Amino acid sequence: MKIEYKKYTHISFDLWLTLIKSNPEFKKKRNLLFKNFFEIDSTMDKVSEVVRYYDVLGNNINEKTGLNIDTYELYYLILSALQVDIAKIDTDKLSQFYEETAALFMEYKPELIFPDTKKLFQEMTNEDKSINILSNTAFIKGRTLRKLLAHYELTDYFKFQIYSDEVGFSKPNNEIFQLVFDEINTFKSAQKKEILHVGDNSVADYNGAIRFGFDAHLLKI
């Protein structure tokens, strides 16, 4: 990962498609689990199609509103679209499914996109740069993503991690970038132009950061 970061005091990183990418087996296994867990009559192809549709739609809505659609809301939308009577499914059932999904996620872990990520973070922190994670979420909650970063031994490099499901805002909303700025200023005095946000999404990451007043690096993989 090539980033010109020397002139900044703090670097903020997106997570998905910036630092990690999905394990191709995970979504297949998750969709099969969804079908079996909720005893859905539809074909696997149909289940996969509907899950994908609401995954993309949820991300698009979050970017448009700047808010965060809850994972369980997405589950209910998918179940309803697959002709399941959601009146018969309480949130405890959804919670059980999420825990099984999280276990599957850690079994079929996302991969680090850049093998030298840990080395880069070490270099940054050695130069007294501080770093954080700022990520929108959908099907996988922030608490599970924290476990993934711990698995890759990256947690200690981050001063903090902010996930949309935990704060109720999504990029490119100014509010979530404000949370980053406020958190940075709890441990150092920093101006907006001293902060670089790195991400792959031109709307959520690049435009959002620039509009707020940070500098931004659009990562192209």
Regions found by a protein language model. Give the residues of each.
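N-terminal helical cap/lid subdomain that shapes the substrate entry/recognition surface
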Residues: 3-115, 127
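Asp-based, Mg2+/Mn2+-dependent phosphohydrolase catalytic module
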Residues: 1-11, 21-24, 112, 118, ...
